[in-house]
Amino acid sequence: MSQYQAVKGTKDVFPDEAVQWQLVEGVVRRLAGLYAFGEVRTPVFEYTELFQRGIGATTDIVGKEMFSFLPDPQGRSLTLRPEMTAGVMRAALQRNLLSQAPLHKLFYISDLFRKERPQAGRQRQFTQFGAELLGASSPAAVAEVLSFMMGVFDALGLKGLRLRINTLGDLEDRARYRDALRAYFLPFADELDESSKERLEKNPLRILDSKNPALKELIAAAPRLFDFVKAEGVAEFEEVLSLLRDRGVSYEVDHLLVRGLDYYCHTAFEVTSSELGAQDAIGGGGRYDGLARELGGGKDMPAVGFAVGMERLLIAMEKQGLLEGLKPVGPKVFVVVQQLELSGHAMQVAFQLRRAGISTELDLAGRSMKAQMREANRLGAAYALFIGQTEFESGQYGLKNLVSSEQSTLTLDSITETLREPLLCG
C-alpha cells in the first residue's frame, strides 16, 4: 500500500465504477439535447467575492465551507467553486450573452468543492449536473427546467422521489417575512442551537433549513412565507403548478421550503429520496432574477436553474437496484498470439482492426496463450483472434466467438467486415 492516500473527502473512481457515472452522464446529455440545452464549462476557481456576493455572505457555504487560498498577484483571494450558478452567471455577463440572443439554455456536469464533513453522498470534492435558463423566468421557463430535471430521473428509472416546491416571493416580500420570522423566533432564542442563533441575527430564513430534530416543531409552527407574497406572485406560482400538472409532473407544495443560497426568488424547489436518510436531498433549484444585478450586471436578468448531486443520485440508484449488472464494456476482439516473435504482427493486426472502428485488445506482457485467454474472458471480450506462424504466413486467422465457442478461419478483411459496427444513416 502506498504511503500516500486520497485526501479525506475525495474519492478515486476506476472503470468498474466509472461506468455508473457514464450511464448518468449519458442520460443527462441525451435529455439536454432533447430540451436544446448546450453545454457550458467554467473555470474551477473564481475570485472569492463572486461567491460572497452571489451566494450570500450569511450562508453556510460562504461562511464555513469554501476552499479559499492564497491571493493572486493582485492580492485578490481565489476560491474553488462550491456551486455553479454564480460562475455561469459571471460568464454570461462577461460574454454579454443576452445582447447576442434573448434566451440561452445551458447545462453542465462539473466538479465542485466544499469543506463538508465527509459522509455517504457528501464529499469535499463532488460532482453536480445542472441547467441554467438565462433570459426568461416565466412559469413556462420554470416548468421547462423542472421537466428537464425530472425527465432525467424518469429516464434513469428512479422511483419514490419527492418534488417539493414553494414560492419565495420577491425582495420586498422576503424582507417583510424576515421581520416576521425574527419576531417569531426571538422569544425562543434560548431554545435555538448556536447555528440558529447566529442565523436569527443575520438571516432568519436560514433557520427553516435547520436539520436539528429538536427544532422541528418550532419551525413547523413558524409563519409561512406564502402569506407574505403579493397577489401577482401567488398567481404566477399557481401558473407554474398548473403547467407541471399539464406535463404530468407530481409535486408537493411545501411552504417551509427555502433554499440554502440567497440568490433564489419566487419559485424554488427541491427533490428528495427516502433512500438517503436524514440528508435526503438529491437536487433542487429555482429562479434567481436578481443575481445578475448582484454581480454587477446593472439590472436583473430573468433566470431559472437546477443542480443535482451525482454521488447522492448514484446512492439512490444503487439502493433501488438500478446499477446491478452494470460493468465496463469489454473489447470486441482480443488478439491472442502464439509465439512471442509474432507480437509485432499482432500489434499491426490490432491497429488495423481499431482503425476500422473495432474495439481491440492484445497481450502486452508476453504471457502464455492460456493466460491470454484468461485475460480475454476477464475483460469480457466477444471474440478471440488467434495468430500463430501458420496464420501469419497464410493471412488466414482463427476467429472464435467466446460466447458460443463457434470458430472460423477468415482473412483480416473478412473479419473486419464481419465485426464492423453498422454505420448509422440518415
Curated annotation (Swiss-Prot):
SUPFAM superfamilies the record matches: Class II aaRS ABD-related (SSF52954), Class II aaRS and biotin synthetases (SSF55681)
Subcellular locations according to the entry: Cytoplasm
InterPro entries: aa-tRNA-synth_II, aa-tRNA-synth_II/BPL/LPL, Anticodon-bd, Anticodon-bd_dom_sf, His-tRNA-ligase, HisRS-like_core, HisRS/HisZ, HisRS_anticodon
Enzyme kind, highest EC tier: ligase
Enzyme Commission number(s) of this protein: 6.1.1.21
GO terms classed as biological process: histidyl-tRNA aminoacylation
GO terms for cellular component: cytoplasm
GO molecular function list: ATP binding; histidine-tRNA ligase activity
Catalyzed reactions: tRNA(His) + L-histidine + ATP = L-histidyl-tRNA(His) + AMP + diphosphate + H(+)
Cell membrane listed as a keyword: no
Entries under Gene3D superfamilies matching the protein: Anticodon-binding domain (3.40.50.800), Bira Bifunctional Protein, Domain 2 (3.30.930.10)
Pfam families: HGTP_anticodon, tRNA-synt_His
Similarity annotation: Belongs to the class-II aminoacyl-tRNA synthetase family.
Subunit structure: Homodimer.
UniProt-recorded name of the protein: Histidine--tRNA ligase
Organism: Chlorobium phaeovibrioides (strain DSM 265 / 1930)
Gene: hisS
